[in-house]
């Protein structure tokens, strides 16, 4: 299938080609085989409405992209959190690759504007349907992997996904206190102590400041709307410091 056959007439063709060119410039990714890029954004409804054309939908690419995404995210988490248990790694990965997270990424990159949809799917709001956008994101990852291999996929995620992990966008699924405890116990360093340093604000909107220490040495300070949340944030800060020190050794 030539890329020219993917669009009905010259006007639509050139408009769509221009969109895909702008998209590649914007994300600093340039496909060698642009057919894979177009396929990643081709919904089955579009193929069904053009049965006489040799179009391919994105479902197989989605299948591949799902596996590639899990692998690359797993590698990143494995390296970043050396003290995290298998169970917590699994929970965190699940939060990153779940539908709402992928939809958010697809929106951020304006994937919906590029999707090729059948008229029926378009009329029923398919372009904004969460499941469709999540599938397109996975298909794009699959297409990029087939086109260029694993390294460019990791580079793409390094720009658009890994910073969100570093910024704690998925920390709601993580138990930092348990991780810190495991890290400390593993090295036989003693017992952790948590202390509330400060609390302020009205009863309905309290803010707490917590300190976590080890043998009298302050490891981390955190704030939160509850004592538990403040302690979790203190543990998160302490864990980040200790892991950074650990990797330097």
Swiss-Prot record:
- Asked if the keyword Protein biosynthesis belongs to this entry, the reply reads no
Give the UniProt keywords, A-Z.
Cytoplasm, Endonuclease, Hydrolase, Magnesium, Metal-binding, mRNA processing, Nuclease, RNA-binding, rRNA processing, rRNA-binding, tRNA processing
Task: Write out the catalysed reaction.
Answer: Endonucleolytic cleavage to 5'-phosphomonoester
Disordered: region residues: 223-249
| Matching CDD domains | DSRM_RNAse_III_family, RIBOc
**Which top EC class is given?**
hydrolase
Q: Cite a single Pfam family from the UniProt record.
A: Ribonucleas_3_3
Active site residues per record: 66, 138
Q: List residues binding Mg(2+).
A: 62, 135, 138
Cofactor(s) in the UniProt record: Mg(2+)
Q: Which GO CC terms are listed, alphabetically?
A: cytoplasm
Among the record's GO biological process terms, what is one?
tRNA processing
| PROSITE patterns from the UniProt entry | DS_RBD, RNASE_3_1, RNASE_3_2
The highest taxon in the source lineage is: Bacteria
Where is the protein found, in the record's own terms? Cytoplasm
Q: Does the keyword Zinc-finger apply?
A: no
Domain RNase III, by residue range, is 20-149
Residue ranges annotated for the DRBM domain, each copy included: 175-244
Describe, as the record does, how this protein assembles with itself and its partners: Homodimer.
Q: What does this protein do?
A: Digests double-stranded RNA. Involved in the processing of primary rRNA transcript to yield the immediate precursors to the large and small rRNAs (23S and 16S). Processes some mRNAs, and tRNAs when they are encoded in the rRNA operon. Processes pre-crRNA and tracrRNA of type II CRISPR loci if present in the organism.
Please give the PANTHER family that the UniProt record associates with this protein: RIBONUCLEASE 3, RIBONUCLEASE III
Q: What is this protein's record name?
A: Ribonuclease 3
Supply the source organism for this entry. Bacillus velezensis (strain DSM 23117 / BGSC 10A6 / LMG 26770 / FZB42)
């Amino acid at each position: 299938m030539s890329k020219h056959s993917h669009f009905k007439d010259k006007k639509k063709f050139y408009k769509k080609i221009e969109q895909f060119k702008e998209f590649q410039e914007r994300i600093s990714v340039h496909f060698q085989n642009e057919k894979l890029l177009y396929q990643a954004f081709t919904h089955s409804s579009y193929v069904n409405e053009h049965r006489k054309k040799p179009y391919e939908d994105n479902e197989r690419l989605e299948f591949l992209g799902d596996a590639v995404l899990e692998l690359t995210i797993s590698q990143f988490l494995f390296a970043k959190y050396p003290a995290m248990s298998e169970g917590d790694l699994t929970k965190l990965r699940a939060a990153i690759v779940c539908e709402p997270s992928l939809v958010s990424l697809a929106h951020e990159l304006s994937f919906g504007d590029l999707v090729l949809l059948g008229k029926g799917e378009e009329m029923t709001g398919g372009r904004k349907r969460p499941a469709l956008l999540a599938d397109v994101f996975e298909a794009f990852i699959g297409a990029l992997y087939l086109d260029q291999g694993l390294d460019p996929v990791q580079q793409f995620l390094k720009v658009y996904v890994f910073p969100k992990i570093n910024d704690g966008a998925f920390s709601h699924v993580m138990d930092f206190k348990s991780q810190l405890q495991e890290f400390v116990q593993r090295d036989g360093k003693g017992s952790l102590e948590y202390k509330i340093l400060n609390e302020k604000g009205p009863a309905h909107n309290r803010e707490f400041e917590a300190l976590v220490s080890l043998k009298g040495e302050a490891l981390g300070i955190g704030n939160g709307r509850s004592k538990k949340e403040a302690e979790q944030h203190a543990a998160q800060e302490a864990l980040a410091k200790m892991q950074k020190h650990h990797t330097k050794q």
